[in-house]
């Protein structure tokens, strides 16, 4: 039997470990006393360490296929696994106290790991049906996570996420149905051989449907409307997760799909348009925000635009995939650092309330500066390397105008991040609010750690680049 025709389930050990840990967390929550549910967190953290370990071991070996060629285990899958599991560990450290105070602690761990499993399935999918399964496995737990805060804003955000997810899920399935109807195949290698002979208009309709669905998961235009509301209304756990982890699977999945699309279809132009609109709209909308989390919600929309740039030149530049993977890793730790600062200061829900932070909490202010300037793309942070290499990939792939748009939008984004940074270094208010001055210590520590990781990834970019190439 051809290796690609074998099931080889052990190649998906990371995904099975993630999903199995979610099941254990869900069941344990029904039997453990409320005071003992911290064991679920220990088990979940151990599972993430296992996922990272398996991913590293499999990345050392050659690229392989599992489940009769439906799932690819390669460098992109390995990076997605490591970024996803490491992101979960940081998120749990940020929101550990919040989760322990919740009556749904075990269920929260379960929902996060179920959604993360869907993200990993998306990242390795080489089959349209597996892509659909990964989409819904990643999306459905998100709706519950957003609504866990039990507030009017969270309920509204959860409803928006559900409605948008259902709509774009339908578009995804419609696109998959069209592509299957045209080719009689769902595996990417078969699609690559048959799509070129299919009617271009029908192929375009199918591709647009699939792209729209993946844009919901990534949080980019045209499926971005729910992201700022969810980032603002959800609790710290859900807000940090939904603006970070789902992007990993969705964008790697989109990259894989574009590699099998026919050259006769102008799909790079479509993705380039989505990239420009996402980064521009996200930056312009973020400029007027006063709530830090809502600002970060719009910021994450703009980041999707930058991440779409290397996908635009997939197959046209050798820099495309490495730049995408490096950017995803750098964005993960940098975005978590920014949200960790907001979680450390839960009483400060507008930008002016951060006034004087550098004098009262200098380490937290330093983490905020590194995170926000990192999201801008300031050296020597990891996102700086990501943006430079994505722009270089666009230039190398003959999309020089797109590289120019990246640099212009990067400059524009600096202004609204400075609206947050400048008050932090101003004079503190004479009459301080006790709620505003209270600091959650674990999120503060994670903010400093994640900011340091962002700097470290930028400093050792050379060796890391070799690993993702």
Swiss-Prot record:
Does the record carry NAD as a key word? yes
* Single GO biological process annotation from the record: ATP synthesis coupled electron transport
Task: Enumerate the catalysed reactions.
Answer: a quinone + NADH + 5 H(+)(in) = a quinol + NAD(+) + 4 H(+)(out)
What Pfam families does the entry give?
Proton_antipo_M (PF00361)
Q: What is its EC number?
A: 7.1.1.-
**Where is this chain primarily localised?**
membrane
Q: Which Gene Ontology cellular-component terms appear in the entry?
A: plasma membrane
This protein's record includes keyword Oxidoreductase: no
Membrane topology is:
Multi-pass membrane protein
- Please give the InterPro entries that the UniProt record associates with this protein: NADH-Q_OxRdtase_suN/2, ND/Mrp_TM
Role summary: NDH-1 shuttles electrons from NADH, via FMN and iron-sulfur (Fe-S) centers, to quinones in the respiratory chain. The immediate electron acceptor for the enzyme in this species is believed to be a menaquinone. Couples the redox reaction to proton translocation (for every two electrons transferred, four hydrogen ions are translocated across the cytoplasmic membrane), and thus conserves the redox energy in a proton gradient.
Task: Please give the name of this protein.
Answer: NADH-quinone oxidoreductase subunit N
Q: Which gene encodes it?
A: nuoN
């Amino acid at each position: 039997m051809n290796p690609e025709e074998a099931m080889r389930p052990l190649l998906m050990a990371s995904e099975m470990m993630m999903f199995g840990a979610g099941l254990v967390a869900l069941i344990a929550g029904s039997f453990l006393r409320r005071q003992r549910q911290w064991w679920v967190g220990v088990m979940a953290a151990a599972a993430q360490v296992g996922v990272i370990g398996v991913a590293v071991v499999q990345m050392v070996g050659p690229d392989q296929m599992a489940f009769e060629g439906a799932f690819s285990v390669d460098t992109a899958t390995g990076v997605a696994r490591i970024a996803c599991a490491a992101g979960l560990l940081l998120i749990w450290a940020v929101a550990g106290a919040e989760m322990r105070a919740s009556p749904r602690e075990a269920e929260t761990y379960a929902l996060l790991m179920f959604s993360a499993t869907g993200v990993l399935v998306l990242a390795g999918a080489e089959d349209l049906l597996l892509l659909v399964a990964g989409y819904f496995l990643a999306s459905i737990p998100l709706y519950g996570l957003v609504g866990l805060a039990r507030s009017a804003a969270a309920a509204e955000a959860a409803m928006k996420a559900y409605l948008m997810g259902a709509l774009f899920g339908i578009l995804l399935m419609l696109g998959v149905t069209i592509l299957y109807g045209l080719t009689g195949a769902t595996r990417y290698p078969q699609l690559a051989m048959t799509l070129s002979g299919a009617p271009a208009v029908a192929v375009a309709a199918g591709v647009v449907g699939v792209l729209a669905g993946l844009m919901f998961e990534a949080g980019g235009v045209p499926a971005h409307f729910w992201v700022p509301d969810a980032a603002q209304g959800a609790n710290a756990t859900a807000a940090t997760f939904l603006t970070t982890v789902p992007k990993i699977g969705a964008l790697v999945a989109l990259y894989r799909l574009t590699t099998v699309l026919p050259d006769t279809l102008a799909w790079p132009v479509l993705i380039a348009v989505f990239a420009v609109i996402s980064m521009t709209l996200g930056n312009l909308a973020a400029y007027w925000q006063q709530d830090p989390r809502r600002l970060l919600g719009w910021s994450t929309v703009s980041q999707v635009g930058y991440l779409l740039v290397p996908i635009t030149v997939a197959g046209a530049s050798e820099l495309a995939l490495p730049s995408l993977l490096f950017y995803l890793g750098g964005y993960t730790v940098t975005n978590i650092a920014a949200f960790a600062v907001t979680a450390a200061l839960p009483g400060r829900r507008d930008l002016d309330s951060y006034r004087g932070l550098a004098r009262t909490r200098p380490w937290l202010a330093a983490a905020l500066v590194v995170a926000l300037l990192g999201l801008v793309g300031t050296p020597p942070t990891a996102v700086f390397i990501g943006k430079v290499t994505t722009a270089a990939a666009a230039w190398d792939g003959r999309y020089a105008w797109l590289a120019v748009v990246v640099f212009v939008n990067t400059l524009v984004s600096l202004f609204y991040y400075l609206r947050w940074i400048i008050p932090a270094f101003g004079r503190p208010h004479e009459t301080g609010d006790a709620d505003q001055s209270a600091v959650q210590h674990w999120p503060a520590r994670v903010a400093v750690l994640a900011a340091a990781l962002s700097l470290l990834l930028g400093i050792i970019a050379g060796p890391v680049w070799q690993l993702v190439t």
